[in-house]
């Protein structure tokens, strides 16, 4: 697009962005400085804000608003603004956005579905290797139940598949969609089967697995609500040897029922990254958890930055501008950029590989030591850099017997 054409599209854009969006300056600075209006003396601005404390007065003259999940975007926030032309959330969840209100005002909205799915899957894997070491568990003998077969559940499924760990998926929405697609194909006589091939099971079947990992959005009401999906009734049916991992939304588990269960002496092993009532967590529950963290499962550098990239692409599309940047332009090398493996794959090697990139015990320790002095949001804002497996290149020597590291997401040496 020629710069003169751009000047007609963009007039002194004020882009407001959450201060915790990585590479926002790099992605968006040129978009707000393109040429600004016919007189040429207006300047666009790129303005960071603190997500939890954003006010209507602050964003009264925003053209573009880019948030994360802690900012409620609704009439209360936007009633003073009459020029907003784009709202983006650099997150997978959208329950903090009043999409009906935005639609009523014809304000385009974009989120970043799947942006941190890999990060969350790697958090779960790190938790599993930590608990396997702590309790001498053979991961290959466990069955994992995944609640939610969307982006995050699918990435976890892929990693478990790479490790040969048996797992089951419960997702009634996807199961219904699968059945409907099969009906349509049969009715149309379509010889090519394009349906989702996965076998979905009931919630009861998943809750009987050795490990239960939750990956659903918060849904209140409707045919398949997830609000307090795990409650007193089904939590009390779990047995002492099970592991429960929640890295989705805090309201999916009734935290008070979970606390009552543990106070009664139940042996359930709990990994909690999300909490009811964030940022105010049920403090009494923390000592009963194996791993406790501050809603950071999706906080890898890649996961957060992918959200910035997806919103940049969406805004470029709306402005009819060719995207100039991609995430690879900005990602730094990992602290250990490459390793060579000359042994056969084993749980010991898995333990070493996962912890080398991300040891969830670091975040658990920070949470327990600093929650009461720093606060929940501060732990998220000041989260230390964490990379995904893909940041590390793994070379396999010829005598190794499997490419599991690459199937887990570690990079291959480019030829």
Where are these regions (language model features)?
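Phosphate-coordination loops involved in phosphoryl transfer and adenosine-cofactor binding
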Residues: 12, 84, 140-143, 241
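NAD(P)-binding Rossmann-fold cofactor-contacting core
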Residues: 163-181
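N-terminal glycine-/charge-rich "phosphate-binding" loop or analogous flexible N-terminal tail
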Residues: 6-62
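Phosphate/diphosphate ligand-binding glycine-rich loop within oxidoreductases
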Residues: 63-136
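Glycine-rich adenosine-cofactor-binding loop
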Residues: 19, 113, 121, 140-161
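Rossmann-like adenosine-cofactor binding region
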Residues: 73, 176-283, 409
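Oxidoreductase and adenylate-handling cofactor-binding alpha/beta cores
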Residues: 121-137, 162-163, 309-318
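Rossmann-like dinucleotide-binding domain for NAD(H)/NADP(H)
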Residues: 241-244, 248-412
């Amino acid at each position: 697009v020629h710069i003169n054409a751009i000047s007609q599209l963009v007039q002194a854009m004020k882009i407001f962005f959450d201060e915790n969006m990585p590479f926002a300056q790099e992605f968006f600075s040129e978009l707000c400085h393109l040429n600004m209006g016919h007189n040429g003396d207006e300047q666009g601005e790129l303005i960071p804000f603190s997500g939890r404390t954003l006010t209507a007065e602050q964003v009264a003259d925003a053209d573009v608003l880019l948030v994360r999940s802690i900012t409620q975007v609704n009439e209360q926030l936007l009633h003073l603004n009459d020029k907003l032309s784009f709202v983006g959330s650099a997150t997978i969840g959208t329950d903090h956005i009043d999409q009906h209100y935005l639609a009523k005002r014809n304000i385009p909205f974009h989120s970043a579905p799947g942006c941190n799915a890999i990060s969350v899957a790697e958090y779960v894997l790190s938790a599993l290797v930590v608990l396997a070491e702590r309790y001498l568990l053979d991961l290959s003998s466990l069955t994992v139940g995944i609640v939610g077969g969307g982006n995050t559940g699918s990435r976890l499924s892929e990693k478990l598949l790479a490790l040969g760990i048996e797992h089951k998926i419960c997702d009634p929405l996807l199961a219904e969609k699968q059945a409907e697609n099969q009906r349509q194909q049969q009715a149309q006589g379509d010889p090519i089967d394009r349906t989702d091939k996965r076998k979905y099971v009931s919630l009861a079947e998943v809750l009987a697995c050795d490990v239960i990992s939750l990956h659903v959005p918060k849904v209140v009401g409707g045919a398949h609500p997830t609000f307090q999906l795990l409650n007193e009734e089904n939590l009390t049916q779990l047995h002492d040897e099970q592991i429960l991992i929640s890295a989705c939304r805090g309201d999916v588990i009734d935290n008070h029922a979970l606390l009552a269960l543990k106070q009664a002496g139940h042996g359930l092993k709990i990994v909690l990254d999300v909490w009811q009532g964030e940022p105010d967590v049920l403090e009494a529950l923390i000592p009963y958890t194996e791993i406790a963290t501050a809603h950071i499962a999706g906080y890898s550098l890649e996961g957060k930055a992918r959200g910035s990239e997806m919103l940049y692409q969406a805004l470029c599309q709306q402005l009819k501008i060719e995207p100039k940047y991609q995430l690879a332009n900005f990602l730094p090398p990992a602290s250990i950029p490459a390793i060579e493996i000359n042994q056969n794959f084993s749980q010991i090697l898995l333990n070493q590989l996962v912890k080398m990139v991300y040891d969830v015990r670091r975040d658990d320790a920070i949470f327990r030591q600093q929650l009461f002095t720093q606060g929940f949001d501060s732990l998220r804002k000041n989260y230390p850099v964490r990379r995904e497996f893909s940041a590390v290149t793994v070379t396999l020597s010829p005598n190794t017997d499997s490419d599991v590291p690459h199937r887990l997401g570690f990079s291959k040496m480019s030829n």
